[in-house]
Amino acid sequence: MRGGGGCVLALGGQRGFQKERRRMASGNGLPSSSALVAKGPCALGPFPRYIWIHQDTPQDSLDKTCHEIWKRVQGLPEASQPWTSMEQLSVPVVGTLRGNELSFQEEALELSSGKDEISLLVEQEFLSLTKEHSILVEESSGELEVPGSSPEGTRELAPCILAPPLVAGSNERPRASIIVGDKLLKQKVAMPVISSRQDCDSATSTVTDILCAAEVKSSKGTEDRGRILGDSNLQVSKLLSQFPLKSTETSKVPDNKNVLDKTRVTKDFLQDNLFSGPGPKEPTGLSPFLLLPPRPPPARPDKLPELPAQKRQLPVFAKICSKPKADPAVERHHLMEWSPGTKEPKKGQGSLFLSQWPQSQKDACGEEGCCDAVGTASLTLPPKKPTCPAEKNLLYEFLGATKNPSGQPRLRNKVEVDGPELKFNAPVTVADKNNPKYTGNVFTPHFPTAMTSATLNQPLWLNLNYPPPPVFTNHSTFLQYQGLYPQQAARMPYQQALHPQLGCYSQQVMPYNPQQMGQQIFRSSYTPLLSYIPFVQPNYPYPQRTPPKMSANPRDPPLMAGDGPQYLFPQGYGFGSTSGGPLMHSPYFSSSGNGINF
């Protein structure tokens, strides 16, 4: 009977559990009037254990924490989240965000009476984060109403690098909008900064941002043109010195001397970074594409006209980037100034080439050969500049082994020392010159013809460490004549080390014996190529064509089964040798007799 009563009690408890489950799943623990439909089906797992086991289950902080996490994931507002019957709290629904946060904090403080330290710390951290977020949102929304008082109003959300709205009289409210922009950038929210001096406070600002800002600023009017030019130059100098761009709200109208000083500092920085060559008198990597004479410089900033000219407002970097690319026909015309067979240009055309540069740019060039004046810069093709020193260093690497008897490389003539007059041949003409021409019996690889050694009349690859490709235009490249020529005897040990021991040549145990080299070269029936001997002649009758011998030390243990065909007979029969000689040496059998020891 006791067991039956227990069953009845269990059934009653199960019915109550199903009722509770149905109530929680349908209405989320709330009356039907305020029931909220969750995003997904309400599973039993996130609820505390005393709901879906029985009412007397001991509660701990883990249950409450899981329940709160489930409520936050479901997306329910804090005021209408389901609470259990033991913790029903009369929470008023507060309309504003501040009241909602305060009520949530009060609930959390009431609920945290029976929690342990870890859950308290987690909840305090979460509350502090939500409080900071709400304060920041309220302050930003309150301060964004200040610039919205003007008839223009605020625009939609946009990235910070976009152009601000063009407002004629927008000089009245720069301060509050910049503060708002700083706070919103800390929250990683892209809001437009509505002012005439929009500055993105970011370390990742690029030249595109400066160009966009300068183009917008240039259309404002004529009264703040000098201030805009100073701000843009200051931005360029800060960007080049690799610091994040700060807002220049306190910058005054600079005079023309300050503008020229900033431009000169920018020019020096560009020269130090972009025109640094490999040596003091080396050319600075200027290819003929970059040696085109630039256009005459525009008017200086002290001669600014009264009309709003957009090109006058651009900073130095913007002028560099807005330069049109050079015409390929003009480049081809300048490349055809040199004769294709000679290394140095014609003197008259070289002087004519230099005479086309302005005098101010000749003074600014100096020893480095850079061509950058105060107002302009001659970087007509900036993406091609970093590749030129790499090509030149590669050329000097190839020419490192070929020296003249005087000790200087061949291509280093007096044109190279002259600084700006240095003009390499074009890449097209170099590729035309380097076509492989097979003259005589000497194989010429795809290297320039000037890369032959001066002391030995041989191609350059004879001095390198790797063997040449097998070109049979000369009889000295055949293997059977290599021992007769002392000039090419240096490659013999390399080719001996080239072949692995495949069982065909047992003489290769001593690879540097000249008699064995002569034997295995001249015993062949035809001319063997580089590494075809073990594969072309597998059945040639060599006298030592036997399995590899064991070591002569009798203390070595015999090899185990599976190591290869070491023995012709198994050890159990006691046959240790044949008539051809001993095949193995074992501590159990003697190699002197027939190997049978009983």
From Swiss-Prot:
InterPro entries with a match to the protein in the record: DUF4688
Protein name: Uncharacterized protein C1orf94
Any Pfam family the entry gives: DUF4688
Source organism per UniProt: Homo sapiens (Human)
